[in-house]
Amino acid sequence: IAIPSQALTIDYTKDGSAQALVSKIGFNILNANRIPQRMVFYVKPDKKVVNAVTYFRDRQIVVYGGLLTYSDNEDELAAVIAHEISHAIDSYDGVLRGFFSPVTYSLKPKKYEYKADKRAVDFVVKAGYNPLAFITIMNKIDSQPRYELFSTHPLCSRRLAAVYEYIYTKYPQYLVQNEYKDNIYYQNFLLTSRENRLKLQEKVKNNSKKRIKYL
């Protein structure tokens, strides 16, 4: 059962409401998905930093104040936190299996970003949040560098297209009953992703299993 989107009305400069909210969302995702690995969630009230990061060594997920400013509801914040939880899980797997390290991540960072995006969609759905918020928050905060080669992350347009395809394939009910259809950031995604969505339509039409090369 999806939780109705709740607007963020917090003043994280005056009290601990931001910390309480981030912890609540984080532990809700952990518990709903039966994730046994230990991790903690912190807020750094720096409004100039629009980001969330995972510190592999300490399994700390840090949400910066700027991200709270850009997040319009709990769905969007949950999408980002779920993405970082995926990275934290991989850090645990590395300690236990000996294959994951910052060096490994630095060699194939885009692979881990795509993996974290898809797993985050699963996590938020299981926790009762709307996965389409992943598209709206990413469209707001993730820049589109001119050259992907020199970036540690895939192009935002490709990440958005891959997330949309994953939701379309695995959770189509969220597109049928789309509570974000009138959201200006979702509308902008529809505008800017037309070519990529046509590629997806062609794949579905031909019942193809090939991976789409998104733009």
Name these PLM-found stretches.
Residues 67-68, 72-76, 84-100, 128-129:
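Catalytic Zn2+-binding segment of zinc metalloproteases
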Residues 60-65:
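Short, aliphatic-rich beta-strand segments
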Residues 42-44, 78-82:
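Short, functionally critical alpha-helical segments immediately adjacent to catalytic or ligand/cofactor-binding
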Residues 81-90, 115, 119:
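Active-site His/Glu-centered metal-binding helix of metallohydrolases
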Residues 42-59:
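Catalytic zinc-binding patch centered on the HExxH motif and its immediate surroundings
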